[in-house]
A protein has these predicted regions:
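Von Willebrand factor
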Residues: 30-159, 162-166, 172
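Bacterial N-terminal signal peptides
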Residues: 10-19
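Acidic/histidine-rich, surface-exposed loop or edge segments in extracytoplasmic proteins
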Residues: 30-44, 127-133, 210-214
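Bacterial N-terminal signal peptides that target proteins for export
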Residues: 1-10
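Extracytoplasmic/secreted cell-surface and envelope-processing proteins
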Residues: 44-48, 80-84, 173-177, 219-224, ...
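Von Willebrand factor type A / integrin I
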Residues: 187-262
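Boundary at the C-terminal end of the N-terminal hydrophobic targeting segment
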Residues: 24-28
Length: 262
């Protein structure tokens, strides 16, 4: 009988031990990594930049929580050769609770301390964003392709959920590719995508949730052609880019948990 009792109790003890000591009992999520590329080309007017700033300050920043990462970088004509983040922060993660080692009151105090740190860092980032947006940047070209290659590097081995936000009109404008001068057609899109793929200019963004805010062009027809190109581009990159998240303003924010799932 004692042996039977021991056999009955042992699994229960093991389950209790796992529940109290396993991080999954009260583990924090891995968080979200939000990378923002901001268009500083001459085609972006001051009104558009002001809207970008509002979207960062009123939508993106408030959605960040403990454990999240934010990086903001420019889209300009020297993205690859002179890349430098404009703003970056990693918010401290919420502490995990273990029934074996943690006192409840002590744990709650640690959580409160982290929450205060997160609020302070977000306020600091808001000030930094305002400082960046207040400066006079103006690039002669818009090299979005290079920015997306940088995004691939930034997301490499990133354990957090990956979200890419492009604040741009999405008009590539470089000596090699000028979207306003292309005679757009379905065959032209496929030809350009094949050329970019052959030149290794389509990054690997598998599992990255993509948002575009600021998409525009001189005509509705051109805007639609460019949107169709980017739809094919991101599909080849492996990113999660839905047409509903490609717009003139930031829509459907914050990202749903299913955004990065293919």
């Amino acid at each position: 009988m004692p042996g039977a009792l021991h056999r009955a109790i042992t699994p229960a003890v093991l389950l209790l031990t796992q529940a109290l000591s396993s991080p999954s009992a009260a583990a924090t999520s891995t968080g979200t990594a939000v990378i923002i590329f901001l268009d500083f080309s001459g085609s972006i007017q001051s009104g558009e930049r002001a809207r970008y700033q509002r979207e960062i300050e009123t939508l993106i920043l408030p959605s960040l929580s403990a454990g999240d990462r934010l990086l903001m970088a420019p889209i300009h004509d020297k993205t690859l050769t002179e890349f430098r983040p404009l703003v970056q922060v990693i918010l401290p993660a919420k502490p995990e609770f273990s029934g074996w080692r943690d006192n409840v009151l002590t744990y709650k105090r640690r959580v409160k301390e982290v929450e205060t740190q997160v609020l302070d860092l977000k306020a600091k980032v808001k000030t930094e964003v305002a400082g960046v947006m207040g400066k006079r940047y103006s690039s002669p070209y818009t090299d979005i392709f290079s920015s997306l290659l940088i995004a691939q590097k930034l997301f490499h081995d990133e354990p957090r959920r990956k979200v890419l936000v492009l604040l741009s009109d999405m008009i590539e404008d470089t000596p090699e590719y000028n979207f306003e001068k292309i005679a757009w057609s379905p065959s032209a899109v496929e030809k350009l995508l094949a050329e970019l793929e052959a030149k290794a200019l389509i990054p690997k963004l598998l599992g990255v949730c993509v948002y575009v805010s600021g998409a525009s062009a001189k005509s509705a027809a051109l805007a639609e052609d460019i949107a169709r190109f980017w739809e094919g581009y991101f599909r080849r990159s492996g990113a999660d880019m839905q047409p509903s998240r490609y717009a003139h303003v930031l829509l459907h924010w914050p990202p749903s948990q299913s955004c990065h799932q293919q």
